[in-house]
């Protein structure tokens, strides 16, 4: 695995995590 795909994988993980956090927060937690 090269550095570019590794960076994209980390970016997608952070994006998905923050997005789910926002949705979870708006749900009224």
Curated annotation (Swiss-Prot):
<keyword id="KW-0793">Thylakoid</keyword>
<keyword id="KW-0602">Photosynthesis</keyword>
<dbReference type="InterPro" id="IPR036143">
    <property type="entry name" value="Cytochr_b6-f_cplx_su8_sf"/>
</dbReference>
<keyword id="KW-0150">Chloroplast</keyword>
<comment type="subunit">
    <text>The 4 large subunits of the cytochrome b6-f complex are cytochrome b6, subunit IV (17 kDa polypeptide, PetD), cytochrome f and the Rieske protein, while the 4 small subunits are PetG, PetL, PetM and PetN. The complex functions as a dimer.</text>
</comment>
<dbReference type="InterPro" id="IPR005497">
    <property type="entry name" value="Cytochrome_b6-f_cplx_su8"/>
</dbReference>
<dbReference type="GO" id="GO:0009512">
    <property type="term" value="C:cytochrome b6f complex"/>
</dbReference>
<comment type="function">
    <text>Component of the cytochrome b6-f complex, which mediates electron transfer between photosystem II (PSII) and photosystem I (PSI), cyclic electron flow around PSI, and state transitions.</text>
</comment>
<dbReference type="GO" id="GO:0017004">
    <property type="term" value="P:cytochrome complex assembly"/>
</dbReference>
<dbReference type="Pfam" id="PF03742">
    <property type="entry name" value="PetN"/>
</dbReference>
<keyword id="KW-0934">Plastid</keyword>
<feature type="transmembrane region" description="Helical">
    <location>
        <begin position="3"/>
        <end position="23"/>
    </location>
</feature>
<keyword id="KW-0249">Electron transport</keyword>
<dbReference type="GO" id="GO:0015979">
    <property type="term" value="P:photosynthesis"/>
</dbReference>
<protein>
    <recommendedName>
        <fullName>Cytochrome b6-f complex subunit 8</fullName>
    </recommendedName>
</protein>
<dbReference type="GO" id="GO:0009535">
    <property type="term" value="C:chloroplast thylakoid membrane"/>
</dbReference>
<keyword id="KW-1133">Transmembrane helix</keyword>
<keyword id="KW-0813">Transport</keyword>
<comment type="similarity">
    <text>Belongs to the PetN family.</text>
</comment>
<dbReference type="GO" id="GO:0045158">
    <property type="term" value="F:electron transporter, transferring electrons within cytochrome b6/f complex of photosystem II activity"/>
</dbReference>
<keyword id="KW-0812">Transmembrane</keyword>
<keyword id="KW-0472">Membrane</keyword>
């Amino acid at each position: 695995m090269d550095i570019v795909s590794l960076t994209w994988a980390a970016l997608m993980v952070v994006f998905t995590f923050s997005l789910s956090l926002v949705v979870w927060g708006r749900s009224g937690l």
